[in-house]
């Protein structure tokens, strides 16, 4: 059962990663490519903020 769930999850994620936007939204493709990295910027911002206040 677990093997089936893992395989199913992999298939869904691989389809999600490889899918293309509809032609009407092709203009936003570069923005969509960058969107998964945005949370990393917030994580790094926390370190910059703490460095600015001397890691109190």
UniProtKB/Swiss-Prot annotation:
One of its GO terms (biological process) is photosynthesis. Its main location: plastid. It is found in: Plastid, Chloroplast thylakoid membrane. The chain crosses the membrane at residues 35-55. One of its GO terms (cellular component) is photosystem II reaction center. Coiled coil: none annotated. It is a single-pass membrane protein. Residues 1-19 form a propeptide. Keywords: Chloroplast, Membrane, Photosynthesis, Photosystem II, Plastid, Reaction center, Thylakoid, Transmembrane, Transmembrane helix. It comes from the Eukaryota. PANTHER family: PHOTOSYSTEM II REACTION CENTER PROTEIN K (PTHR35325:SF1), PTHR35325. HAMAP family: PSII_PsbK. PSII is composed of 1 copy each of membrane proteins PsbA, PsbB, PsbC, PsbD, PsbE, PsbF, PsbH, PsbI, PsbJ, PsbK, PsbL, PsbM, PsbT, PsbX, PsbY, PsbZ, Psb30/Ycf12, at least 3 peripheral proteins of the oxygen-evolving complex and a large number of cofactors. It forms dimeric complexes. Belongs to the PsbK family. One of the components of the core complex of photosystem II (PSII). PSII is a light-driven water:plastoquinone oxidoreductase that uses light energy to abstract electrons from H(2)O, generating O(2) and a proton gradient subsequently used for ATP formation. It consists of a core antenna complex that captures photons, and an electron transfer chain that converts photonic excitation into a charge separation. This is Photosystem II reaction center protein K. It comes from Welwitschia mirabilis (Tree tumbo).
């Amino acid at each position: 059962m677990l093997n089936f769930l893992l395989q199913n999850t992999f298939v869904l994620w691989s389809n999600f990663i490889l899918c293309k936007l509809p032609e009407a939204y092709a203009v936003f493709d570069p923005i969509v490519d960058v969107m998964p990295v945005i949370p990393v910027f917030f994580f790094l911002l926390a370190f910059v903020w703490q460095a600015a206040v001397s890691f109190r």
